[in-house]
Amino acid sequence: MDQKLLTDFRSELLDSRFGAKAISTIAESKRFPLHEMRDDVAFQIINDELYLDGNARQNLATFCQTWDDENVHKLMDLSINKNWIDKEEYPQSAAIDLRCVNMVADLWHAPAPKNGQAVGTNTIGSSEACMLGGMAMKWRWRKRMEAAGKPTDKPNLVCGPVQICWHKFARYWDVELREIPMRPGQLFMDPKRMIEACDENTIGVVPTFGVTYTGNYEFPQPLHDALDKFQADTGIDIDMHIDAASGGFLAPFVAPDIVWDFRLPRVKSISASGHKFGLAPLGCGWVIWRDEEALPQELVFNVDYLGGQIGTFAINFSRPAGQVIAQYYEFLRLGREGYTKVQNASYQVAAYLADEIAKLGPYEFICTGRPDEGIPAVCFKLKDGEDPGYTLYDLSERLRLRGWQVPAFTLGGEATDIVVMRIMCRRGFEMDFAELLLEDYKASLKYLSDHPKLQGIAQQNSFKHT
């Protein structure tokens, strides 16, 4: 055998991964690689790069779950090669999907379905769910306008400070977005300003049940009642879609007396993230319609399933079934009792943080993490006229040096001069972990007090997560 080939073969067989030739070069990033390498070497390169990511458990900006038990990992692994869209090939996964739809519909007080199956679908997240809910709103509105012989070329959607997905929906589906702007003292959509924005071209009103900027609920019932009066005065009937990305899996367990869901007759659809407070792994969302009449059949495609056909309505197509199966595991594992305990624990942490942080500076709280107020988030600003010697951007930057990702950012609309800090409390961020955050918070305040010349340098480098 050629000596070079023998040497190469011996190296490939015996070299440790850190002695391998492939790891002594910079990983390809611009061109498709020419040559193969050992699997352990490729894994090591990627694994080492991922150490540069932030620690997900210390990410207090995200609404998404960052902790999953070992059974979720096992189920995800079992389902990695099952295509969610292939109902005929994977009938049991499809059956589990339908069970979840029924469970979520029951949680949100949807009317009992005529055929025993609730109307809804799993999505890749709440953004896709919002898109689907918005499409159905536009189609229903267009039908009504056509039946009345009126033009359908100027649809609009009325909402408060919404997540970016609604801006995408408006642009992609050619709908005017009438977003009620945040302003000092009026950070959320109120009935008066909502009604002023509505007309016969309004396809629907979208309250956000858990506003991303602050964590507060935009309560649907007062808006719903105002729309009732608007219809009585004008004859214009306007539907509601509830964007419950976070609140949809919180209020049913910890604040069941809040009337926000299908108990309100105008609510035709609700969307939520399974991978936020639904406790599923990333890549899971849900949208549920009130009944079959609320989902225009032109939007539904039929696919083969158990010798018959089943309707499907989605923007995405091929994707693994693992997220749905993991969501079903959480539903079975926890039930109403378990979800109530898990979510209450997050609220207790939020309340503790709000109480302790209030002692540390001149802060005005927008959200204190109470179940009757919003999601388990703590959001605050510096009191007007107060100068503690640092900005919230400075504080965010100092906390980041200890691994904590706590965003400081300006509000939107007409409130862009208001800088807030927001802390999300989720499963896995337990009381002991919160105490460690407080210790680093206090240490950061001391550092900023001892180094006043460094104030303000972090402003351009801070980040937001809304």
UniProtKB/Swiss-Prot annotation:
Keywords: Decarboxylase, Lyase, Pyridoxal phosphate. Its EC number is 4.1.1.15. The modification N6-(pyridoxal phosphate)lysine is found at residue 276. GO terms for molecular function: glutamate decarboxylase activity; pyridoxal phosphate binding. Substrate binds at residues 62, 83. Induction: By acidic conditions. Expression is regulated by a complex system involving RpoS, cAMP, CRP, EvgAS, H-NS, GadE, GadW and GadX. The level of involvement for each regulator varies depending upon the growth phase and the medium. It comes from Escherichia coli (strain K12). This is Glutamate decarboxylase alpha. It comes from the Bacteria. Homohexamer. Belongs to the group II decarboxylase family. The keyword Transport does not apply. The keyword Aminoacyl-tRNA synthetase does not apply. Its cofactor is pyridoxal 5'-phosphate. It is an enzyme of class 4 (lyase).
